[in-house]
A protein has these predicted regions:
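Formylglycine-dependent sulfatase
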Residues: 1-219
Length: 219
């Protein structure tokens, strides 16, 4: 949005409609000229192919709707084949593993050169997907409700000197600037689209929201 590539609410025409202006080069263009090795792992919400934008290695996660499948992803701009997918594939782990691989190889083969690594995880983005074993770790943590959780976290931040202010109030009228009735219907009666007080939720909503937060934490 800062370079008017993406949609700009309230501005006629809506920005560059997905095309980056010529006057907005990526930082990798300058770094490569100065001898940097450039690596990319994860999202690529930029027009053009990764390697054509002055990166040397890339793991491009296009399958953002399923954290447990590599279908549609690209390795160095080439479609990733199903037979290459490791057992128990999970997008976040695969992205981190690719980053580690790039930096390990850099230290072995290009130790004399500086590097830049653009690491962009899909998580925590909808859909909320995480390994079941990790979700279990957080299963009951959020049943206390978001009001109590935010109070506890705020108190801890004040204790360590990170904040010197008061806890903000809930703004129950603030939510997405769009409605999603189809999604609400699909997700069921446990879903809400406004940050209301925890004690205003039904038992079903509390369980549903606590589960969502547990999965979010596990991501």
């Amino acid at each position: 949005q800062q370079v008017r590539r993406d949609a700009l609410p309230g501005i006629k025409g809506g920005g560059g409609r997905g095309v980056r202006p010529k006057w907005a080069p990526l930082v990798t263009e300058f770094l490569k000229k100065d001898g940097y090795r450039n690596y990319h792992s994860g999202k690529w919400h930029i027009d053009g192919k990764v390697l054509e934008n002055d990166f040397h290695e890339s793991w491009r996660v296009n399958n953002q709707g399923n954290f447990f499948s590599s279908k549609g992803n690209l390795l160095n701009d080439i479609p990733f084949q199903p037979e290459q997918e490791p057992k128990n594939y999970y997008s976040t782990t695969a992205t981190a593993s690719h980053a580690i691989k790039c930096l390990t190889e850099h230290s072995q083969d290009h130790a004399d050169k500086p590097f830049f690594h653009y690491l962009a995880f899909i998580a925590p983005h909808f859909p909320l997907h995480a390994p079941q074993k990790v979700i279990q770790k957080y299963k009951n943590r959020y049943l206390a409700g978001w009001d109590k959780m935010r109070e506890q976290r705020f108190a801890k931040q004040k204790k360590i000197g990170l904040l010197n202010t008061t806890l903000s109030k809930l703004e129950p009228e603030v939510g997405p600037p769009y409605s999603f009735p189809d999604a609400i219907q699909k997700l069921g009666p446990g879903e809400i689209n406004r940050p209301v007080a925890w004690n205003q939720l039904s038992k079903e909503q509390k369980i549903f929201q606590a589960t969502k937060m547990a999965i979010h934490a596990a991501m």
